[in-house]
Amino acid sequence: MTDTIRLPDELGRAIQRRRQALRLSKKALAERAGKVREVVYRLEAGDDVTVSSLLAVLGALGLAMRIDEAGLPTMQEVADRFADDDD
């Protein structure tokens, strides 16, 4: 699984996809990570959590984080980001 993640909601969707692929409930993932279920809910919603909570959940999913230079977003990424805007 390799995703380019630029926004919190993209991170949330990636975590949710991985959890579902592993057939884990939010409660089961939280237990594996040693965190409360609220952490998983917040992550999947794109809300703020501590870095240590993020790393614990990623580890419980068998994932790791890698830091790369971001560069400019692609036209598709910009279009996707603003697709839901009503303006």
Task: Describe the role of every protein-language-model region.
Residues S52-D68:
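DNA major-groove recognition helix of helix-turn-helix/homeodomain DNA-binding modules
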Residues V36, D47, L61:
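The DNA-recognition helices of helix-turn-helix-type DNA-binding domains
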Residues D68-D87:
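Short, charged recognition helix plus adjacent turn
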Residues A14, S25, T50-S53:
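Residues that mark the N-terminal boundary/hinge immediately upstream of a DNA-recognition element
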Residues R23-Y41:
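Short alpha-helical DNA-recognition segment
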Residues M1-A21:
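A short, Lys/Arg-rich alpha-helix, primarily the initiator
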